[in-house]
């Protein structure tokens, strides 16, 4: 900070200009440090090259590190120009001073600058500003929705890597029309599209809680798989081989209710501890088996996969005359 005399008396008035600390050289007459005078009401601060002129009342009004420095409990040194040197970045020091004066201050919009201001507030122990910055950062995190990214599986190895790299439950849809050997029934194309559309809707709704994968290289035509804590929990296969005419046909179904059920069931695997056994049994994850011991039930549960599969190929001789039959495993 500096001031200069102007007008007719400029030649007679002594200059009030103070040399900046950066202009002071060792060995010069102005070089050297001396204690801050105790009767001064004003303080000149050089914070990392940023110059500030404020009052002792502002610096000591709140219980901060600056109050500890300037309350007289410790000796504060100034250079020959009267500047108190503080070895910190001065970028946000003006905001710190404004908060000490007014008790509030507009916060930066940038998350990066907000984090920098939080760091300076912590250094100077300005508790109110620390809390304001932390709250603003938390609100920014809550307002930013996670991206809806759906990886496409290109190999079994990649699938295992994806399953191992996430802590979220996983929903995978395999759809690969090239696996079909027969003609489709009249509703199969429509049902295949419905499965894909439902997958997209679920991904938009639950992408913050579940990882969704697409598989276009598997050996099924349409199949849903549900994973929790790295292992497969349930599987819903939507294809079957039927006799609608005198030849085999591929039928694609759309078990919407079952898909919704398994998607909601897999959410119980969100916690690192895994699902509660009572909740797992209530959702159909436990076996009946009245004669089995509790330990056997728990061991079986670890390796059991709930499946709805339509796999069996029905020959012409096995089919009752004039009827369409679908066998489910």
UniProtKB/Swiss-Prot annotation:
GO cellular component: Cul3-RING ubiquitin ligase complex; nucleus
Biased composition (Low complexity): 1-15
Principal location listed in the UniProt entry: nucleus
Family matches, as CDD domains: BTB_POZ_KCTD13_BACURD1 (cd18400)
UniProt-annotated stretches for the region Disordered: 1-21, 280-302
Gene Ontology MF term list: small GTPase binding
Origin: domain of life: Eukaryota
Key words, A-Z: Nucleus, Ubl conjugation pathway
One of the Pfam families matching this protein, by short name: BTB_2
Keyword Nucleus in annotation: yes
Domain BTB: 41-109
InterPro entries documented for this protein: BACURD1-3, BTB/POZ_dom, SKP1/BTB/POZ_sf, T1-type_BTB
GO process annotations (BP): cell migration; negative regulation of Rho protein signal transduction; positive regulation of synaptic transmission; proteasome-mediated ubiquitin-dependent protein catabolic process; protein homooligomerization; protein ubiquitination; stress fiber assembly
Family statement: Belongs to the BACURD family.
Stated role: Substrate-specific adapter of a BCR (BTB-CUL3-RBX1) E3 ubiquitin-protein ligase complex required for synaptic transmission. The BCR(KCTD13) E3 ubiquitin ligase complex mediates the ubiquitination of RHOA, leading to its degradation by the proteasome, thereby regulating the actin cytoskeleton and promoting synaptic transmission.
Protein name: BTB/POZ domain-containing adapter for CUL3-mediated RhoA degradation protein 1
